C-alpha cells in the first residue's frame, strides 16, 4: 500500500517520548497536530526548500525574495546569517499562508525556542541532536535534523523527527539515497548540500522526500554582485525540475 508523508508523521508522532497528553498540552510553545501535519503536507507537495546564509543582513531579504519570486514556497534562514530571526519574523508576516518559513543551523533548545518565537514553522539542525528533536516532537514542531549515516537517520526518526536531513548530500548522491530509502522505506530523507540546479529531480526520483538548495541556488557571485535576477532564474529552473517529479508519496 502507498503511504503519504502525513501518515508517516502519525507513525513518527506515536514514537515520541511523552505519554501524557495533559503534560504535553501544558508545554510552552505547543503547536497543534493540525499545524504539524500542515507543515509536513507542504513539504510533501513542494519538495524543495531554499536554504540561505549570507554574509550581510542587507543581502538576505533580497536574495530570499528572489528565490520566492522564482517559485520557492519553503524557505530556511540560517542562524549564521546576521539578523536571522528578524528576517524570519519579517518573511513570516509578509508571506504567511503562502510561503512556509523555517530556521536552520539550530544547535540548542534555546536556539529552537528563539526561532519559534520569531515565527519559524519548522526547525533544522546541521547534526543529529536528540534533545532538540525531542523538544520539538513534544510540542508538535517539525524538526529536520542533519544526519550522515543510515544509523543516524534511523535514530533521528526514532527520536521523533518526521524528516531527516542528509547533510552533506554530496557524500553519496542520488544513488546513496536510493539504496538507503529502499532498505529503510519509513525514512523521509532530505538531502541538502550537493543538490544543484540539475540534479534536484534525480534525488527525488531516487527516493528523497524533499531537497534543500544552498549555494547553487544562491550563487555567491550573483549575490555579491546583487544580481538577484539570476537567483530568481536559478530558482525557477530548480522548481521546474522538481515539479516534473510530482508530490511525495512512498511505499510503506
What are these regions (language model features)?
Residues 15, 26-112, 116-118, 138, ...:
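Conserved N-terminal beta1-alpha1 strand-loop-helix module at the mouth
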Residues 51-53, 74-81, 98-107, 120-129, ...:
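Catalytic beta/alpha-barrel core
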Residues 1-30:
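N-terminal mitochondrial targeting presequence
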Residues 150-162, 174-183:
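Anionic-ligand binding region
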Residues 68-73, 95-98, 116-123, 138-144, ...:
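Glycine-enriched alpha-helix->loop->beta-strand junction motifs that scaffold or abut catalytic
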Residues 126-132, 166-174, 208-228:
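Glycine-rich phosphate-binding active-site loops on the catalytic face of alpha/beta enzymes
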Residues 59, 87, 110-111, 131-132, ...:
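Short acidic active-site motifs
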Residues 108-118, 151-159, 195-210:
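Catalytic cores of alpha/beta
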Amino acid at each position: 500500500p502507498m503511504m503519504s508523508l502525513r501518515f508517516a508523521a502519525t507513525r513518527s508522532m506515536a514514537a515520541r517520548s511523552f505519554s501524557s497528553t495533559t503534560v504535553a498540552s501544558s508545554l510552552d510553545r505547543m503547536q497543534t497536530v493540525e499545524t504539524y501535519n500542515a507543515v509536513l503536507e507542504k513539504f510533501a507537495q513542494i519538495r524543495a526548500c531554499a536554504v540561505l546564509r549570507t554574509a550581510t543582513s542587507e543581502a538576505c531579504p533580497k536574495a530570499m525574495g528572489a528565490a520566492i519570486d522564482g517559485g520557492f514556497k519553503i524557505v530556511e534562514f540560517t542562524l549564521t546569517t546576521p539578523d536571522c530571526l528578524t528576517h524570519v519574523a519579517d518573511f513570516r508576516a509578509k508571506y504567511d499562508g503562502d510561503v512556509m518559513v523555517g530556521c536552520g543551523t539550530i544547535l540548542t533548545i534555546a536556539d529552537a525556542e528563539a526561532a519559534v518565537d520569531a515565527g519559524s514553522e519548522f526547525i533544522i539542525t546541521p547534526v543529529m541532536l536528540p534533545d532538540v528533536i525531542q523538544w520539538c516532537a513534544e510540542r508538535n514542531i517539525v524538526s529536520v535534523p542533519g544526519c550522515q549515516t543510515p544509523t543516524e537517520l534511523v535514530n533521528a526518526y526514532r527520536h521523533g523527527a518526521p524528516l531527516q536531513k542528509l547533510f552533506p548530500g554530496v557524500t553519496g548522491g542520488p544513488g546513496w539515497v536510493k539504496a538507503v530509502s529502499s532498505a529503510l522505506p519509513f525514512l523521509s530523507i532530505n538531502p541538502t548540500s550537493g543538490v544543484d540546479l540539475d540534479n534536484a529531480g534525480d534525488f527525488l526520483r531516487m527516493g528523497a522526500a524533499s531537497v534543500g538548495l544552498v549555494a547553487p541556488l544562491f550563487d555567491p557571485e550573483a549575490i555579491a554582485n546583487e544580481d538577484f535576477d539570476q537567483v530568481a532564474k536559478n530558482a525557477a529552473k530548480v522548481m521546474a525540475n522538481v515539479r516534473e517529479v510530482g508530490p511525495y508519496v512512498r511505499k510503506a
